[in-house]
Amino acid sequence: MRAYERLLNYVKVYTTSDPVSDTHPTTARQFDLARMLVKELQDLGLADAHVDEHCYVYATLPATPGHEAAKGLGFIAHMDTSPDAPGENVKPQIHENYDGGDVVLPGTGAVLSTRQFPFLAKLKGQTLITTDGTTLLGADDKAGVAEIMTMLEILQKENRPHGKICVGFTPDEEVGQGADLFDVEHFGAAYAYTVDGDEAGEISYENFNAAAAFVTVHGFSVHPGSAKNAMKNAQNIAIEFHNALPYYDRPE
């Protein structure tokens, strides 16, 4: 099966995560795709494929003879889609032999403009897959899942030599919890790639890393008639705190 054929199957499975949920996974529906992938992995010969109670899928493709000593190489992608737009009843649109111009999404009339997305011009002549505009497509990151699954199929069909291949599919990446309960030791890879990126052929060898904090600032209210050198404005204190943060360490 081609990678795009798998993608078309996967995007029809509703897997939107929930940023306000306190469960792991944040939505039980993510198990629907997880179980589908476990079955497909087992059919591809990865006999140990399984999904744990928190919706993490793990599987291993053993090394081919003569390559058992190679360090395990991992490939990771996430199954959930962003809650910022609808993720149910996805209707993929296939644009064959794309002409390099603006793309109109038929469900809403929204336009994917080459002015806003200049990289589209590089894709002239290729086949594009988009949403109809009423939902997300879900290629983030079901395209990554499809690519990993297709790689596993090709490695075996073409008898390509390889070391141990470790596969991990995670829930809840879109709400910042994808790695929270990922079992690195159980995964078993010495090195790993996350297949979730930008243009074809691009590799990011480092990533932005940050933590979040909730800061509460308490002011001190004094009658304006006697406030000089006594009143404390919480907003101004918060501004001072914000400006004290290292400028070049901020995401922007």
Ranges and model annotations:
Residues 19, 48, 161-164, 246-252:
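Flexible, glycine/charged-enriched surface loops at secondary-structure junctions
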Residues 2-28, 129-130:
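N-terminal capping segment at the start of a domain
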